[in-house]
């Protein structure tokens, strides 16, 4: 990802592709963003429209589904990049205007840029622009973001759909967690220490008493 973003910076599209990898927006949603959609102070991005191509013309329409209308929290670094990008064209309401037309980017043009970035970064995998959305989701789950939160960020209609989509990731994480728990249980049983006293009845949750090892 580091090499990919370096190439995006060279190409002059770092803010756009950084935002994509840190928010997982759909391509049309990303291209339809306007400056007024960003709350700089709260670091919140409002997603409520998309760019599509209909009969050869670019058109701004409502999002894919009602769940696609959402607010997405951003990192400070992402906000800083967006502010810097806007300062280059302060009179244009579009967050990512096409340098050629000043209007919205064509979805196909952005996909072609993605291929160029991949090639220049030496990434041989066939990564479509939509796969950047999957990359974000994979990083989020691997970083410990719960599925319900991720689902709302992606604009999915249910957490169950998100879980089904990324079940291979959560399965790997579960196996990793099982190994950690197994190692912990082995160390506990090997220690053969006496059980600590029972916790008070008013405890909010009940667990099998254990002694912290290490």
PLM regions with names:
Residues 1-33, 40-41, 69, 77, ...:
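Basic, Lys/Arg- and aromatic-enriched nucleic-acid-binding interface segment
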Residues 3-14, 23, 72, 84-104, ...:
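Short, basic (Lys/Arg/His-rich) helix/loop patches that form interaction surfaces
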Residues 42, 55-80, 84, 100, ...:
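C-terminal secondary-structure termini that scaffold catalytic or DNA-interacting sites
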Residues 49, 64-66, 148:
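A general lysine-centric signal
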Residues 49-51, 78, 86, 154:
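Short, small-residue-rich loop/turn micro-motifs
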Residues 51, 154-180:
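Catalytic-site neighborhood detector that most strongly recognizes the C-terminal catalytic loop/helix
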């Amino acid at each position: 990802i580091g090499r990919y973003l370096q190439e995006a910076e060279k190409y002059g599209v770092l803010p756009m592709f950084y935002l994509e990898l840190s928010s997982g927006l759909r391509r049309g949603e990303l291209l339809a963003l306007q400056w007024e959609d960003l709350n700089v102070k709260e670091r919140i991005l409002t997603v409520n429209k998309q760019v599509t191509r209909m009969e050869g013309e670019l058109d701004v329409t409502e999002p894919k589904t009602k769940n696609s209308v959402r607010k997405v929290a951003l990192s400070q670094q992402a906000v800083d990049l967006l502010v810097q990008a806007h300062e280059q064209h302060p009179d244009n309401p579009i967050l990512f205007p096409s340098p050629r037309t000043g209007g919205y980017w064509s979805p196909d043009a952005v996909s072609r840029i993605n291929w160029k970035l991949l090639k220049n970064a030496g990434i041989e995998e066939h990564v479509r622009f939509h796969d950047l959305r999957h990359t974000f989701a994979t990083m989020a789950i691997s970083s410990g973001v719960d599925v319900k939160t991720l689902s709302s960020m992606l604009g999915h209609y249910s957490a169950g759909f998100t879980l089904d989509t990324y079940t291979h990731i959560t399965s790997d994480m579960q196996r990793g967690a099982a190994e950690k728990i197994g190692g912990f249980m082995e160390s506990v049983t090997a220690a053969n220490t006496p059980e600590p006293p029972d916790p008070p009845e008013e405890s909010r949750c009940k667990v099998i008493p254990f002694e912290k090892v290490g």
